[in-house]
């Protein structure tokens, strides 16, 4: 949204311009706290809806239950929406205790928003230019990288829909001016005055001091955040190219585990390696700061016959056969519980390890699915008895995958190893053992 004069007279036109990409959405949800920012946003939208063909408006108030005074806010918000003719919903959430009450409340709030967004819906929130400047300062003091210093994007994916912040180019002074001219009422959150919260200190003490010396400080800081956002976009585009150049095809692609060729990545500069790895791993795990990437270098530079891994918050990165593999935390745990297969005509659900089935005529006898314990031996037609470890080596099954690989037994006889050619069924091909591995959205303890 372009900036303008501080009186805010042109806010409706500027807002309509900022929302142009979202005019075809089915519903515009408005995050409505009852404070100044969201009150002005909702009023502007309701007024615009009288003369423009806009998506349906639906206000959502999230009650965090953190202070007694907030109990009156849902009713205030309901009355405001009733007067504006806007659909209203109040949602009470539970804020999980943690080191940061602000962060926990934000997570609970956005979880509630995400739950309500349908495909193509848009959530509109009222963050403004001063909020953007505050966010940049806060993250700068925490040592954030380019992505963090880009502060709040104007739009991003949120659940099945999108989040848009159409007021990021508007100052708080403009919002206050508009609210007074329109005679709007809003609630004041007393926690915003609590100096124990770092952002409140920046808002009430640091930014006013900066603007007293540099009147355009907030506009300059917000503009810098925009420049950094553009720089991050370029870094993302470069990383996407590097990921594409490192795509790997393995015999085990059906497992659905993220895999890249190490060679093309290792040939990049150190900074570019970290950029592509951040891009690839960001949807999969929380990442360390820039001072804690020694694990990546150790994995990258380990000897060819080593089994290096880089353990991260939500899983681990492994290396095998010239590739790097991402394993979620659940995959790190070997399975040990044997499962009896009473009716091999039906698929068998394995505890936290997907499902196996038999294609063709099932072998006779008492069947069960087990996992590697060591020293297993398998009889192969024309080859005699062979150590399972050697057979898995021949099939190039990475060692870190073997602990979850289903083995079919009849009594104590190893009959088959799921999905591995030559090991997955009977010599006469009357049956095959098939395994559908657990996917990322299945529960893995």
From Swiss-Prot:
UniProt xrefs under InterPro entries: Lysidine-tRNA-synth_C, Rossmann-like_a/b/a_fold, TilS/TtcA_N, tRNA_Ile_lys_synt, tRNA_Ile_lys_synt_N, tRNA_Ile_lys_synt_subst-bd
Location in or out of the cell: Cytoplasm
Keywords for the protein's UniProt record, in alphabetical order: ATP-binding, Cytoplasm, Ligase, Nucleotide-binding, tRNA processing
Classification via Gene3D superfamilies: 1.20.59.20, HUPs (3.40.50.620)
GO cellular component: cytoplasm
A Pfam family reported for this protein in Swiss-Prot or TrEMBL: TilS
UniProt superkingdom: Bacteria
Binding residue positions for ATP: 33-38
SUPFAM superfamilies: Adenine nucleotide alpha hydrolases-like, MesJ substrate recognition domain-like, PheT/TilS domain
Reactions catalysed: cytidine(34) in tRNA(Ile2) + L-lysine + ATP = lysidine(34) in tRNA(Ile2) + AMP + diphosphate + H(+)
UniProt-listed Enzyme Commission number(s): 6.3.4.19
UniProt record, GO biological process: tRNA modification
Gene Ontology terms, MF aspect: ATP binding; tRNA(Ile)-lysidine synthase activity
Function: Ligates lysine onto the cytidine present at position 34 of the AUA codon-specific tRNA(Ile) that contains the anticodon CAU, in an ATP-dependent manner. Cytidine is converted to lysidine, thus changing the amino acid specificity of the tRNA from methionine to isoleucine.
Domain notes: The N-terminal region contains the highly conserved SGGXDS motif, predicted to be a P-loop motif involved in ATP binding.
Protein family: Belongs to the tRNA(Ile)-lysidine synthase family.
PANTHER family, A to Z: TRNA(ILE)-LYSIDINE SYNTHASE-RELATED
Protein name per UniProt: tRNA(Ile)-lysidine synthase
Organism of provenance: Pseudomonas syringae pv. tomato (strain ATCC BAA-871 / DC3000)
């Amino acid at each position: 949204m372009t900036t303008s004069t501080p009186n805010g007279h042109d806010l409706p036109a500027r807002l309509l311009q900022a929302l142009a990409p979202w005019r075809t959405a089915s519903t515009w949800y408005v995050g409505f706290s009852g404070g100044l920012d969201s009150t002005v946003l909702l009023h502007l939208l309701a007024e615009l809806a009288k003369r423009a063909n806009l998506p349906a408006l639906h206000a959502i108030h999230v009650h965090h239950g953190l202070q007694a005074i907030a109990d009156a806010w849902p009713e205030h918000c309901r009355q405001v929406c009733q007067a504006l003719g806007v659909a209203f919903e109040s949602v009470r959430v539970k804020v999980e205790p943690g080191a940061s009450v602000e962060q926990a409340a934000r997570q609970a709030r956005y979880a509630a928003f995400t739950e309500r967004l349908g495909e193509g819906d848009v959530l509109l929130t009222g963050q403004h230019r001063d909020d953007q400047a505050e966010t940049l300062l806060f993250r700068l003091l925490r040592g954030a990288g380019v992505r963090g210093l880009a502060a709040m994007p104007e739009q991003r994916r949120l659940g099945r829909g999108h989040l848009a912040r159409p007021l990021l180019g508007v100052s708080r002074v403009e919002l206050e001016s508009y609210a007074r001219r329109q005679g709007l009422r809003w609630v004041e959150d007393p926690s915003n005055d609590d100096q124990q919260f770092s952002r409140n200190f920046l808002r009430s003490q640091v930014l006013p001091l900066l603007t007293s010396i540099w009147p355009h400080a907030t506009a300059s800081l917000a503009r810098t955040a925009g420049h950094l956002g553009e720089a991050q976009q370029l870094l993302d585009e470069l990383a996407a190219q590097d990921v594409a150049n490192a795509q790997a095809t393995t015999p085990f692609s059906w497992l659905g585990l993220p895999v890249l060729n190490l060679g093309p990545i290792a040939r990049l500069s150190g900074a570019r390696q970290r950029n592509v790895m951040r891009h690839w791993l960001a949807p999969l795990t929380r990442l360390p700061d820039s001072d804690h990437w020694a694990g990546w270098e150790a994995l990258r530079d380990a000897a060819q016959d080593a089994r290096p891994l880089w353990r991260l918050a939500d899983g681990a990165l492994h290396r095998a056969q010239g590739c790097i593999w991402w394993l979620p935390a659940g995959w790190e745990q070997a399975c040990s519980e044997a499962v009896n297969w009473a009716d091999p005509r039906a698929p068998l659900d394995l505890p936290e390890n997907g499902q196996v089935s038999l294609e063709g005529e099932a072998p006779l006898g008492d069947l069960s699915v087990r996992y590697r314990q060591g020293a297993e031996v398998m009889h192969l037609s024309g080859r005699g008895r062979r150590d399972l470890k050697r057979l898995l080596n021949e099939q190039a099954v990475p060692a870190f995958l073997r602990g979850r690989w289903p083995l079919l037994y009849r009594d104590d006889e190893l009959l088959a190893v799921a999905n591995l050619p030559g090991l997955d069924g009977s010599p006469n091909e009357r049956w095959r053992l098939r395994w559908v591995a657990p996917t990322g959205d299945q529960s893995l303890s």
